[in-house]
Amino acid sequence: MKNYVKRIRESYRKELNVIEVNDLPLILLTEVINQSILRGATKIKVSFDGAILMVHDNAAPLEDDDIMWRVTCRHEGMMSPERRRMFRILDRQWSSPPYAAVNALCKKFKLIVSKGNRLHSIICNDGIVTSDNIGEVGIGDGNMVIMEPMIEASGTDTTMIGEMMELIQERFPQVTITFRTRV
């Protein structure tokens, strides 16, 4: 675990220019927080229950899919052709229920953004979107992002997520980022 955190820290110090696909959770979380700040957020809350990261902010509500589009485009070049095809397919499936097409493509990684109390956008990469996950969307006020780290369950650890939070807080000193665990 310490080596994993060290690798994340080293990659982060390089401005995220060179980073492995397994480190996507840190990149995506950084991007989400950056987008929250651009929308005027001054307080960001991150919680972790052992498997899922939840991010709340006090920014203005999302009005379109810009945040998801930027995240997709930013990281598409780092993925294999198969994963790029998956993302392009998912681009077309975001607002098209039922979610069977998404479920068929996914196994391990997901990023869900809510807009108010309705499902807003989904990015999945080897992850499964279940009714339980969708049920989490829209809880509380403001915007919420649910992200499941793309790591094995045995490697899911609050210490690692806490390290990520410290790095991200250093990157964004102008906002208050709080971290709590529900493990």
Predicted segments, located by residue:
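Bergerat-fold GHKL ATPase/HATPase_c domain
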Residues: 1-34, 38-42, 65-72, 158, ...
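N-terminal assembly/transducer modules of large multi-domain enzymes
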Residues: 2-5, 37-41, 49, 130-183
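Short hinge/gating elements
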Residues: 11-20, 80-92, 141-158
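ATP-lid-like helix-loop hinge signature
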Residues: 27-62, 130
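Structural motif
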Residues: 43, 52, 108-110, 144
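Flexible glycine-/small-residue-rich
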Residues: 48, 57-59, 113-115, 147-149
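Flexible ATP-lid and adjacent glycine-rich G1/G2 motifs of the Bergerat
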Residues: 60-128
